[in-house]
Amino acid sequence: MSVKWEKQEGNEGVLTVTVPAEEVNAGLDKAFKKVVKQVNVPGFRKGKMPRPMFEQRFGVEALYQDALDFILPDAYAAAVEEAGINPVDRPEIDIEQMEKGKELIFTAKVTVEPEVELGDYKGLEVEKEDTEVTEEDLNKAIEADLARKAELVVKEEGEVAEGDVVNLDFDGYVNEEAFEGGKAEGYDLEIGSGQFIPGFEEQLVGTKVGDEKDVTVTFPEEYHAEELAGKEAVFKVKINEVKSKEVPELDDEMAKELDESVDSVDAYKEKYKKDLQEQKTLQAENNMKESLIAQAVENAKVDIPEAMINTELDRMMQEFEQRIAQQGLNLELYYQFSGQTEEQLKESMKADAEARVKTNLTLAAIAKAENIEISDTDVDAELSKMSEQFGLSVDDIKAALGNGEVLKDDLRIQKAIDVLVKESKEK
């Protein structure tokens, strides 16, 4: 097989591939074995029609597409490897020559991974963060923990306040006409959660159980339901029940409930302060790395193909869908509550997707410039670390990761970041 790679403008190029005639004939043989099983011809059992008779009746051309399906994937993969390129999108393939007994010639228009022009990445300056844990830090963290242990208690008297959970019925109207999705009974809504249309929750503050109130809001201009976008709506709301959050006091029993490894408030605070110190130190290290990465990326130049941005966008959408699923939502409900469309959500993510791609390309280029290689020892050490972290066997982790190259790429990036840290300067 012969391969010719012609680089074109930007990140485009064309592969011209010539496949030997014997491989073409082997592909035609496979195609015939597949196709003949589907042919019914009087006088022959299904799948038993002789090849010469098949070609005489249907023409050898009837086998070409199936033969290409057998030949092209392996031929294209081998051509990519021989040319030493890294495609980032599906190729546009054109068949130049396909004939029994002759070479197959095809071209593949390919978008390849761009080359990065690195700027300064050594000697970058970074501020050293204060990692001391103050009493104020500790108290805020404890208050947050206690708030998570809060119980909802029915509020018999008093007005609805921020943070209360209100059970309500509502009927929505636009131009005095009910609309789809605008009615609910016994709905629990936390005031201040931002679940509803802007302005809805705020108007419930100050109401009481049994109150009935008209709440007037305006749907966002970019609301997913076009028939409601930008329109004013009136919701007739009835307050059925109000619950407030009752935060427990911190005593020895509560300390043990918050952390089973301690038996008193003092022990809880001591351990918690140590944990916070470790977290703050780790956060400072991460912030330093993020600052150095951001500077290195800012200093680099690269022309990113749209295909790479779109691939990253798809990955980010999957991550987002998984996150909201943990909150009991799906994308359809999210669009309804947020007033966004899928296109608007993707557009809001596009800058981050491009930044992610540029970051990965820049770090990979630094790893290449520094001749960073990952040994089997590096991989084994990381697998052991992951095994301990996740409580899984090394074999299970290998199975979950699939291609070992993915882990090697991750380790290569980590070592590139280590270079940034090692070569940095404190402001």
UniProtKB/Swiss-Prot annotation:
It is found in: Cytoplasm. Consists of 3 domains; the N-terminus binds the ribosome, the middle domain has PPIase activity, while the C-terminus has intrinsic chaperone activity on its own. It comes from the Bacteria. This is Trigger factor. Pfam families: FKBP_C, Trigger_C, Trigger_N. GO terms for biological process: 'de novo' cotranslational protein folding; cell division; chaperone-mediated protein folding; protein transport; protein unfolding. Keywords: Cell cycle, Cell division, Chaperone, Cytoplasm, Isomerase, Rotamase. PROSITE patterns: FKBP_PPIASE (PS50059). It is an enzyme of class 5 (isomerase). One of its GO terms (cellular component) is cytoplasm. Involved in protein export. Acts as a chaperone by maintaining the newly synthesized protein in an open conformation. Functions as a peptidyl-prolyl cis-trans isomerase. Its EC number is 5.2.1.8. Belongs to the FKBP-type PPIase family. Tig subfamily. Gene3D superfamilies: 3.10.50.40, Trigger factor ribosome-binding domain, Trigger factor, C-terminal domain. Residues 163-248 form the PPIase FKBP-type domain. It catalyses: [protein]-peptidylproline (omega=180) = [protein]-peptidylproline (omega=0). The keyword Transmembrane helix does not apply. One of its GO terms (molecular function) is peptidyl-prolyl cis-trans isomerase activity. The gene is tig. Its main location: cytoplasm.
